Amino acid sequence: METLAQHRHARSSAQKVRLVADLIRGKKVSQALDILTYTNKKAAVLVKKVLESAIANAEHNDGADIDDLKVAKIFVDEGPSMKRIMPRAKGRADRILKRTSHITVVVSDR
């Protein structure tokens, strides 16, 4: 049984989150949680919360056994960018893009 959890509009760029997502794709959830716990990146905290949510969803909604679960799919899509202005010298201004991402984790007992 596949169970899904999402974090939409996560305040980190998709490029940065994908580095962490690639570490746990296809792993057992216990091993994936250990990897995320000791990964020293902001994105690891975001992905870990989504993974824990997917595990809880599988246990509560589908009655799955946590020991059998693995990360079947994990993907990160770009979310909307917040546009900000940064003043520069001589009356100019630069545009700053504060990027967001949508993190999706699918756990499965197969």
Curated annotation (Swiss-Prot):
UniProt family annotation: Belongs to the universal ribosomal protein uL22 family.
InterPro entries, A to Z: Ribosomal_uL22, Ribosomal_uL22_bac/chlpt-type, Ribosomal_uL22_bac/org-type, Ribosomal_uL22_CS, Ribosomal_uL22_sf
Keywords, comma-separated and alphabetical: Ribonucleoprotein, Ribosomal protein, RNA-binding, rRNA-binding
Organism field: Klebsiella pneumoniae subsp. pneumoniae (strain ATCC 700721 / MGH 78578)
Keyword Ribosomal protein appears in the UniProt entry: yes
Function field: This protein binds specifically to 23S rRNA; its binding is stimulated by other ribosomal proteins, e.g. L4, L17, and L20. It is important during the early stages of 50S assembly. It makes multiple contacts with different domains of the 23S rRNA in the assembled 50S subunit and ribosome. The globular domain of the protein is located near the polypeptide exit tunnel on the outside of the subunit, while an extended beta-hairpin is found that lines the wall of the exit tunnel in the center of the 70S ribosome.
GO molecular function, one term: rRNA binding
Subunit and partners: Part of the 50S ribosomal subunit.
One GO-annotated biological process of the protein: translation
Alphabetized Pfam families for the sequence: Ribosomal_L22
Gene that this polypeptide is encoded by: rplV
SUPFAM superfamilies linked: Ribosomal protein L22
Assigned GO CC terms: cytosolic large ribosomal subunit
Residues spanning the membrane: none
Superkingdom, natural source: Bacteria
Protein name: Large ribosomal subunit protein uL22
Keyword Magnesium: no
PROSITE patterns: RIBOSOMAL_L22
